[in-house]
């Protein structure tokens, strides 16, 4: 594996250290504080131009730069909180140790140093080292500092190296963690109970998507990795959990692009005795909380877009959006043949087997979605593309449903839940027919879920949001791979060849 000549040399140096009685991978090492805390504690030295501190402390870091000047060495070390310059010499750590480490400690190594804060002759805040311990010897060579990792694919494959070379990457994922904590706290503060539902399902349900299939050896049956937790969460509402949510991983065996990864994080909540209008209000509250927590202000940059969060989110009905935003004639959107004609004339694929609702969805995807820049709720979807949604009392062909769009991306989907078991059963049967007609993502029949509904579920609104896409918007990232620590990648035979 380690065939690079420079790596071989580093392995030899590790062996040389062992021969000198130095373990290149010691354990039970402790530090007093991180670099940020060290800088804060001794900031008075730089502020008052004091030459040095009286107190010695122990800190650690990875060597990012090293410069030897005769009997002394300057280096820059970095940890999770920041970086600082260190200085050591033959006089400060002893000639034997100095000569030992001068040759065998290099850029990339992690070291533990003991010393005091001081200002160099040029006024640079530094640590005057009195003792140095090698904490972990690096065998692989870091990329050259000023070029870093130019290959994006390598950054995703070797996220650890990406974070070493670019501390802002680590900061982004710390912000992602803050976003997740804020979401969780937001719902807990409003009385929602967090639960965990199965990751392996007997029936791939809760969303229209292609599942990953695995096999349970003990039961000798195929299982599907979770595409959505919806049907299990609604079973809990039937059982009396009236405000429930889950934030977890879901899996969909579909294509990968800038906004899709086969393994992703979503949050879903189910809220009995509330409706989709109240869910829209709650969604706006959540975004306001996130913007406040991240100190982002009301106008967000996203690529070359400006997203305005200063106003209430726009609300527009699905069919109205086709006319007003998609600029499609009202006569076309209600006629299946006219929709097919328009799609084909504009160069889009059109499946003649699709019903009117699914063809309207083709219009929406091609003519409307990308134009929804500022936060917009699209409401009242066709029932045929909403198999789990409650029908509108005013129009049985319309579902009481909304989706939230920002920057041309769908972020959230919600609806008043269908709680009529007979209607749900018929919808499942219609989905089976859709699958026969070529819809690979049509919902399967789930008789146990219908049975659960037959015990009566109170009026409930359900809501789901893609956490990864949300993080993309909040952190101004163009690719979902930039907000997932280890995104899905096509395997390569030899990582060294890629490097």
Curated annotation (Swiss-Prot):
Gene Ontology terms for molecular function: ATP binding; lysine-tRNA ligase activity; magnesium ion binding; tRNA binding
Gene3D superfamilies: Bira Bifunctional Protein, Domain 2, Nucleic acid-binding proteins
InterPro entries membership: Aa-tRNA-synt_II (IPR004364), aa-tRNA-synth_II (IPR006195), aa-tRNA-synth_II/BPL/LPL (IPR045864), Lys-tRNA-ligase_II (IPR002313), Lys-tRNA-ligase_II_N (IPR044136), Lys-tRNA-synth_II_C (IPR018149), NA-bd_OB-fold (IPR012340), NA-bd_OB_tRNA (IPR004365)
Keyword Transmembrane helix recorded: no
Pfam families in the cross-refs: tRNA-synt_2, tRNA_anti-codon
Keywords: Aminoacyl-tRNA synthetase, ATP-binding, Cytoplasm, Ligase, Magnesium, Metal-binding, Nucleotide-binding, Protein biosynthesis
Cofactor(s) required for function per UniProt: Mg(2+)
Location(s), subcellular: Cytoplasm
Main location, first listed in the record: cytoplasm
GO cellular component, one term: cytosol
Binding of Mg(2+) 2, residues: 410
GO biological process: lysyl-tRNA aminoacylation
Enzyme Commission code(s) on record: 6.1.1.6
Catalytic activity: tRNA(Lys) + L-lysine + ATP = L-lysyl-tRNA(Lys) + AMP + diphosphate
Family the UniProt entry places it in: Belongs to the class-II aminoacyl-tRNA synthetase family.
Subunit architecture: Homodimer.
UniProt-recorded name of the protein: Lysine--tRNA ligase
Species for this entry: Campylobacter hominis (strain ATCC BAA-381 / DSM 21671 / CCUG 45161 / LMG 19568 / NCTC 13146 / CH001A)
Gene giving rise to this polypeptide: lysS
């Amino acid at each position: 594996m380690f065939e690079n000549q420079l790596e071989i040399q580093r392995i030899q140096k590790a062996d040389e250290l062992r021969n000198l009685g130095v373990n290149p991978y010691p354990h039970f090492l402790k530090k007093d504080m991180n670099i940020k805390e060290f800088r804060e504690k001794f900031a008075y030295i730089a502020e008052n131009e004091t030459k040095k501190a009286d107190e010695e402390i122990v800190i650690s870091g990875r060597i990012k730069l090293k410069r030897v000047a005769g009997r002394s060495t300057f280096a820059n070390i970095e940890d999770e909180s920041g970086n600082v310059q260190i200085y050591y010499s033959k006089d400060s750590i002893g000639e034997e140790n100095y000569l030992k480490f001068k040759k065998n400690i290099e850029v990339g190594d992690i070291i533990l140093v003991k010393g005091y804060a001081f200002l160099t002759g040029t006024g640079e805040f530094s640590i005057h080292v009195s003792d140095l311990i090698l904490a972990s010897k690096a065998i692989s060579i870091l990329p050259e500092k000023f070029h870093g990792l130019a290959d994006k694919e390598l950054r995703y494959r070797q996220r650890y190296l990406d974070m070493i070379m670019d501390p802002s990457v680590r900061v982004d994922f710390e912000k992602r963690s803050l976003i997740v904590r804020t979401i969780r706290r937001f719902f807990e503060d409003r009385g929602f109970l967090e639960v965990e539902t199965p990751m392996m399902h007997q029936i791939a349900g809760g969303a229209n998507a292609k599942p990953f299939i695995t096999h349970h050896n003990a039961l000798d049956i195929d299982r599907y990795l979770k595409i959505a937790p919806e049907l299990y969460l609604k079973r809990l509402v039937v059982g009396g959990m009236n405000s429930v949510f889950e934030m977890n991983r879901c899996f969909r065996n579909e294509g990968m692009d800038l906004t899709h990864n086969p393994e992703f994080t979503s949050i879903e909540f189910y809220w009995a005795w509330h409706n989709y209008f109240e869910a829209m209000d709650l969604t706006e509250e959540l975004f306001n909380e996130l913007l406040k927590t991240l100190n982002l202000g009301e106008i967000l940059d996203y690529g070359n877009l400006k997203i305005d969060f200063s106003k209430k989110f726009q609300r527009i009905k699905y069919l109205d959006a086709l006319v007003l935003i998609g600029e499609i004639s009202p006569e076309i959107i209600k006629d299946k043949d006219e929709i097919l004609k328009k799609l084909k004339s504009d160069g889009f694929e059109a499946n003649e087997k699709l019903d009117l609702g699914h063809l309207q969805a083709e219009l929406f995807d091609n003519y409307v979605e990308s134009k929804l820049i500022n936060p917009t709720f699209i409401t009242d979807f066709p029932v045929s593309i909403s198999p789990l949604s409650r029908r509108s009392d005013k129009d049985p062909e319309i579902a009481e449903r909304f989706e939230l769009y920002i920057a041309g991306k769908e972020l959230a989907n919600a609806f008043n839940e269908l709680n009529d078991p007979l209607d749900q059963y018929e919808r499942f049967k219609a989905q089976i027919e859709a699958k026969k007609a070529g819809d690979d993502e049509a919902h399967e029949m789930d008789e146990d879920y219908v049975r659960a509904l037959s015990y009566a579920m109170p009026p409930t609104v359900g809501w789901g949001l893609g956490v990864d896409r949300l993080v993309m918007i909040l952190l101004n990232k163009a690719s979902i791979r930039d907000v997932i620590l280890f995104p899905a990648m096509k395997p390569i035979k030899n990582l060294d060849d890629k490097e």
